[in-house]
Amino acid sequence: MSTSHASAASARETTEGTVYTVTGGDWDEVVQSAAKSDDERIVVNMGPQHPSTHGVLRLILEIDGETVTEARCGIGYLHTGIEKNLEYRTWTQGTTFVTRMDYLTPFFNETAYCLAVEKLLGIENEIPDRASIIRVLLMELNRMSSHLVCIATGGMELGATTIMIYGFRDRELILDIYELITGLRMNHAYIRPGGLAQDLPPGAVDQIREFVKKMKKNLPEYDKLATGNPIFKARMQDVGYLDLAGCMALGATGPILRSAGLPHDLRKSQPYCGYETYDFDVPTADTCDSYGRFLIRLEEMRQSLRIVEQCLDRLAPGPVMVADKKIAWPAQLALGPDGLGNSLDHIKKIMGTSMEALIHHFKLVTEGFRVPPGQTYSAVESPKGELGVHAVSDGGTRPYRVHFRDPSFTNLQAMAAMCEGGQVADVIVAVASIDPVMGGVDR
């Protein structure tokens, strides 16, 4: 089988493009004729094991010299079957899975999932104020840690190693706070349906206040290193361009959408966890490029510091789990010295109170609570964009289906629009400005 120009092609090229006719022939002849073409385009694979692809992302690039003529993403190398696994676990056990999706934003994964479960249960208005405040506090700390990784790794890929060192230095302070509060640096499963696994430990508030002071002092350093560096600006300005029409067509959200000038933020448009009561701004840019997304992430960290301070001022003593004993675990299974849960005081209370309390606890932990049949969609504004959860219940103790709209997956579809027509070296900048995390993309 071969292709050739039709005799009538020349008359129709200007309006309908080139006309091809298909005639009989051998496939080997077609391949040989293509090889003899004067077109010197080649296809190269960037990844899936490449230091600049933010994980196991494979980019298939067709290049003509140094110009990218076609770009495609190859995903699925980090598929873990989290959505399928949720169908075989209780609603509470689901948090241990969802926290591992986008492993740089675990608290957003947990909150989005728990908000959906609470909506199905009809208890979204019964969550204690202290639990909601702590959720917001942890999410804003998480927003900063995610942006720090994005800025640090993006700078490293451009050769700005100082930004990388500063970014991971400041992120380490946030991970220390995570470890104090949840016992882990990542994969926390701290936010549960109905509230939290446990209250803040002693010293957590003071450590967070100390971090806020340090971060306010350190943030201007990023401005000096990046925005004051003409080489850094030249590498990012007008690179990875995607205007508002492109964002709307591709469903891009987060800093990508806000860099096109639209101040869309779910914390403002569809508030959750009491965000409507906090004072903060939604930064935007009109550059539609990688540099604008970088500036937005810097400003979002400043706004997160404002929200964290408001959270600390609002913290008042109170419960961190709903009062419904059919949902809340007795004593909330406080962490023990081993970090694995079941403190000795808790075990003593359950084992020594009554046989009925032990039976109730056993059934609640092993079988789980039942969720009324129905379906719902819940979304939060993660550092990458809109993180949505579509949860379906059939009335049992396990989810019938849970689907996640991960912003990294959606935003990554814009890669071709950003890169095609540009230079090979600019692909690195464009992908870094998208900030994809393959754990969330592949799930």
Curated annotation (Swiss-Prot):
For this entry, the protein name equals: NADH-quinone oxidoreductase subunit D 1
Catalytic reaction equation(s): a quinone + NADH + 5 H(+)(in) = a quinol + NAD(+) + 4 H(+)(out)
What keywords tag this UniProt record? Cell membrane, Membrane, NAD, Quinone, Translocase, Transport
Per its UniProt record, what InterPro entries does this chain match?
A: NADH_Q_OxRdtase_suD (IPR001135), NADH_UbQ_OxRdtase_49kDa_CS (IPR014029), NDH1_su_D/H (IPR022885), NiFe-Hase_large (IPR029014)
Its record classes its membrane topology as: Peripheral membrane protein
Report the source organism. Streptomyces avermitilis (strain ATCC 31267 / DSM 46492 / JCM 5070 / NBRC 14893 / NCIMB 12804 / NRRL 8165 / MA-4680)
NCBIfam families from the entry? NuoD (TIGR01962), PRK06075.1 (NF004739)
This protein's assembly is summarised as: NDH-1 is composed of 14 different subunits. Subunits NuoB, C, D, E, F, and G constitute the peripheral sector of the complex.
Per the record's keyword annotation, is Translocase included, yes or no? yes
- Has the keyword Transcription regulation been applied to this entry? no
Where found?
Cell membrane
Q: Which family would the database say this protein is a member of?
A: Belongs to the complex I 49 kDa subunit family.
